[in-house]
Amino acid sequence: MDFILNISMKMEVIFKTDLRSSSQVVFHAGSLYNWFSVEIINSGRIVTTAIKTLLSTVKYDIVKSAHIYAGQGYTEHQAQEEWNMILHVLFEEETESSASSESIHEKNDNETNECTSSFETLFEQEPSSEEPKDSKLYMLAQKTVQHIEQYGKAPDFNKVIRAHNFIQTIHGTPLKEEEKEVVRLMVIKLLKKK
């Protein structure tokens, strides 16, 4: 219980700080992953109301503040993409199509559980113990794990968040859905070995 309380307090500090910069949001998400990674992998599942609420808050903030950045060449669509990347890299969440900040705000209450559903599903499916048959996919998984481990530590967080491209493409060719799933399970298996 002390552990959960300690983590919740850390999260409050993270998300109550200035969220106006998308790069800061990326940093905060990276820090959150670093704090949770070992405990999540070892215990299998840690989901609290605080996580659900705070992640939903961050999601809305990214899209909402995009209007501020529009004048600097940072569009609302780019803000939504930033959030999709965060979910994809950190929580294996399916990316969603770009939506307006108004619709995000309207659906915010209904989507409280969405951000953490990935915490649960990530460990419900055990990766296969078989040796990887596709060395390209395995190398891709290893690259992804390397980026996840560096997340929150690298000086350029925007560059790190774009590590999702390692999951999306191989030599510029988009992965098939079944290939993405293979890589996802490989990543889980590699993380559990840490």
UniProtKB/Swiss-Prot annotation:
Phosphorylated on serine residues in the 115 N-terminal amino acids. It is found in: Host cytoplasm; Host nucleus; Virion. It comes from the Viruses. Induction: Expressed in the early phase of the viral replicative cycle. Disulfide bonds: none annotated. Keywords: Early protein, Host cytoplasm, Host nucleus, Host-virus interaction, Phosphoprotein, Virion. One of its GO terms (cellular component) is virion component. Oligomer. Interacts with host HNRNPK. Belongs to the asfivirus phosphoprotein p30 family. Modifies the subcellular distribution of heterogeneous nuclear ribonucleoprotein K (HNRNPK) and may contribute to modulate HNRNPK functions related to processing and export of mRNAs during ASFV infection. Necessary for virus internalization. This is Phosphoprotein p30. It comes from African swine fever virus (isolate Pig/Spain/E-75/1975) (ASFV). The lineage of its organism: Viruses, Varidnaviria, Bamfordvirae, Nucleocytoviricota, Pokkesviricetes.
